[in-house]
């Protein structure tokens, strides 16, 4: 059965409203709200994007369990493996070339979404490339989100290994998983916003 819970995740002194859901209707409502709030500047919309899956310690393939999206202080954590359906609104949102979906290693995340769910991310922007270019730091091309967030935002993201390699396909996610999933997408959004708009 599809479920939706809304959490307030704290990061660097601010709250991020985080919708954790397996409901297609709730995903549509989240997308509709983002489009409504940002309707005057949709051509400049930046969206933090990340995915999670249960790591395999051996051969095989683990399907994408979560899709995380973040715009401003609104974050969506969509439990793909438990979803009742994938709404057309999400497909259209991801496929709109006007919106920039930002993340580290985002091309690989987009490929996973296409292979697993047939979701096309039309405009994926890799923050490692942008950070290296904008900051004149070629070393950031191979950096992870933690190092890039430190360089761009001056923040330290806590990424505990026990959570990172945890059971992302669980129906009930732990508070630590929700915080990790939300902050990854939020920080991707913030780094993208700073680098692409020059607005600190």
Describe each region flagged by the PLM.
Residues 128-150:
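Short alpha-helix plus adjacent loop in nuclease-associated cores
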Residues 1-45, 127, 200:
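N-terminal accessory regions of nucleic-acid-interacting proteins
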Residues 49-51, 78-81, 102-106:
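Short His-Asn-centered micro-motif
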């Amino acid at each position: 059965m599809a479920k939706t819970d809304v959490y307030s995740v704290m990061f660097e002194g601010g709250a991020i409203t985080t919708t954790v859901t397996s409901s297609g209707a709730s995903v549509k409502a989240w997308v509709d709200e983002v489009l409504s709030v940002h309707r005057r500047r949709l051509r400049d919309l930046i969206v933090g994007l990340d995915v999670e899956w249960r790591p395999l310690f051996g051969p095989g393939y683990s399907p994408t369990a979560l899709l995380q999206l973040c715009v401003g202080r609104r974050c969506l954590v969509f439990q793909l493996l438990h979803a009742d359906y994938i709404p057309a609104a999400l497909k259209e949102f991801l496929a709109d070339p006007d919106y920039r979906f930002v993340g580290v290693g985002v091309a690989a995340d987009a490929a996973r979404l296409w292979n697993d769910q047939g979701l096309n991310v039309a405009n994926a922007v890799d923050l490692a490339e942008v950070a290296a270019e904008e900051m004149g730091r070629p070393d950031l091309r191979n950096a992870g989100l933690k190092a890039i967030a430190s360089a761009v935002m001056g923040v330290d993201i806590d990424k505990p290994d026990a959570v990172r390699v945890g059971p992302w396909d669980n129906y009930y996610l732990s508070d630590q998983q929700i915080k990790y999933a939300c902050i990854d997408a939020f920080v991707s959004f913030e780094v993208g916003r700073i680098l692409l708009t020059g607005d600190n």
